[in-house]
Amino acid sequence: LGTKIKRFFKKIRIKRTTVLVLVFVFMSASLVRQLFELQIIQGEAYISKFESRTTKKRVIKSTRGNIYDRNGEELATNVLAYSVTFEDNGTYDSTREKNLTLNGIAYKVLKILESNGDSISTGFHIVLDESGNYAFDVDEGFTLNRFRADIYGEPLIDNLTKKQKNATADQMIEFMSGKEGFSIVLYGDNAYTKEELTSHGLPESLSKQDILELSKIRYALSTNSFKKYMAVTIASNISEKSVAAIRENQPELQGIDIVEDSVRKYIDDASMGPILGYTGQASSEELEELRQKNPDYSNDAIIGKSGIEKYMETSLQGTDGEETVTVDNLGKVLKIDDSTRVEPVAGNDTYLTIDSSWQSAIYQILKQRVAGILLSKIEASKTYDFSVNDAAQIKIPIYDVYNALIANSVIDINKFSDANASDTEKKLYAKFQQKQQQVFDTITNRLTAENPPAVKDEDDQIQEYLTYICDDLLRDTLGVISKNAIDTSDSTYQKWTTDKDISLKDYLTYAASQNWIDISKFSTEGDYLDSDEVYQALTDYLIDYLKKDTNFSKLLYKYMLQEDTISGSEICLVLYEQGVLSKDDGSYEALASGSMTAYDFMINKIYTLEIEPAQLALEPCSASAVITDVKTGDVLACVSYPGYDNNRLVNNMDTDYYAKLSTDKSSPFFNKATQQTAAPGSTFKILSTIAGMSEGVIDDGTYINCTGSFDLVTPPINCWNKQGHGEIEIREAIEQSCNYYFNMVGFKLGQDADGNFSENRSLSVLQKYASEIGLDKKTGIEITESAPHVSDSYAVPSYIGQGTNAYTTSQLARYATAIATSGNVYDLTLLDRQTDSKGNTLKKYEPDIINTVDVSQNVWDDIHDGMYRVVQTHRQFDGLGMDVAGKTGTAEVNVYHPNHGMFVGYAPASDPEYAIAVRIENGYTSGNACLAADDIFKYIFELTDEKSILTGVAASDTSDTSND
């Protein structure tokens, strides 16, 4: 057969090449037919199948309600902005491929944002600290443990293992970035190849900052892992440049989208920060609590974190809308189903009782007054001798002022070692390195020498270093010395805490032997170490830590100043080189040339308020004032100096600014008006009058002979007038603020029918009337307020505002309001009304009188007359131009800190409209609080030209007298 075929082909003479051509023609025809079938006949079906369409619901964000003052001035509003969202909508062959893809997308977006000055914004509690180390931005406690539970995927904190619950920031980043987490960085056999990294747009190595930012993004994305097609917001309020760049690169950024959003904008006024608070991304525990009231809160919800924003959260928060969309496998929206659209509903608006113009002006008044007091106490010296033993005489050495610039981080000492540091900064750093080596040699000796001296035998400088290391660092900051493990009755512990009659080495060695040392904080081999090995590991850890500890470095600079190793002029010049001050201010050249001394320079800058008291955080550095409408209990001003710029805390939070506020020694986050409690001083004598007259131990005809020293108790209590006031009655006693008179009232109230005195009897009467006038409870004000404390010991001193009495300025303002109204005790309020977004009133907040003090009118008459006399006899109110009634108070702290100055009162005296409470912490005397009150009265009643009150410079008149 084969032969026949061959003969056939020979016969028809067809060439082999012809056969090949025929075969190729046949195959091509088949291929064309198949392509026609695929592209023309079934093309749409295959395209539809490839697109893998998915229908999903998409959230339409609502806007938050606005906040206004009592006059309709905008305090908190919303502005249009753009946010970046990330959605995991990909399909992957493996977990490794998934992590590479998501990390690559995250890295590309991160670099686009960073190149345009934008940043990632997620609720994450790990940051890079000043030393470039991973650190938590919250203290140990519930919030941090909840964060740990979220990172380790545990629904309950109690489910955390001991290791997880004690995890450091480093350990948590290692977990998240490693194989168990998001595989951002892998090592050894698991390491990514160069080809894998390149193909996914990732570099061969990542900085610590990059690892942190990628961890933030992946963590945020993981919170929606159970809802894969729900996007999370990873950056807010981004620039137009970032918007354009991301849209341009969107084909490479699967799951990334730009969405219209709104961001919060506050009035540019630091005085409003503590009242308004700020918004931020909700934490897990916050979401858990809020979802009990409204289950619709999303994982990336923005909520009120403090202040009115927090208190009114559920009212201000709008209701999100939604729509159904069809998307392809790349996340591109193909269709919007308008029939399913639910429109978002804006949050309700809130109107406050606050007058924002008063608030701002009073803030300025307090700042000017505090600066004036500070200036009057600064002297050209290195140190102050506290052996003078008189708080009223305390002076502030100029060297303390120079040091304060470093101690309170006005100057950033970590910048001294930067490559681009100025010549002055480099010189300071070179001197610091020499000092640091000397000190480390000494500390190493004290930790390792055979018989180091007891701490009490060291000089003051070394004592401060060693005390800082043990108490501030190892115990309070790092928790290496466990407070809970210490036996406080132990004799060795007592040696350390009382007179330091023990060396640091001996104390730490003993602590290790008693298991007071938490080895897990610095060693992974704790179970295998004896006490000597524990101590050696601790020593190594300590020296290494101190090299990076900014707070310890600040101590070294303090003593470098004292030793004149560095000068005040050098420190002041750095203010310019770090941008704290402008070189165009007219002082730079004079300071740099030496024609202006550092002393004169600082005095000038404090006077002009270019350097504020709060920045220095010396004493005084803070003050507060609260004004109420006596007819309603409305709070018209609630001022805490220093405040803060809440615009820098919302949207893309300025983390450096937040960290600065959190560590600022003037405590701007601590509301001085509603959270700071202190003894009321002689302002409390009005309550003592009510108690004494109501209980019948005195009346308006009772005269008591003030001899200058009340000796019926031990120790005797001196009147401020040590020569005595002689025979005086109640109105004079209030006017003169006679300690003796009110000591006698407290003593009489503690006597029984036989004249026997009982502390408890006297205190119970005081507590009864404190409760009547509302001093035993919070005021009802809608921001964070500390609980008051009515004195429960030292009965007789308690009647002159000492003992253990402690109240906030807001509580003293309610007290003043009750006095002004002859007994009406209001729940104070910051809220006027709520409206919807169209202005329709939903709720009006009405005055709430919680009690009326049941006292005869003649008692009130005596009190009002006495308080009127107080103001008439205080020169600080000379020329005020209206009748005011009030009571001064000076609360003693101790001989190492200036007294607090206070004033409570109301005006006009005959027909009160407003009540006021002013406190200047460490303000030396009540006279300084009176001067602030005088300025406030002049402003709110428009008694003089505003410019003469709000001068913009430190007040030039101060008071050294209290008379209370």
Features from the language model and the residues they span:
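Active-site SXXK
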Residues: 34, 72, 106-108, 246, ...
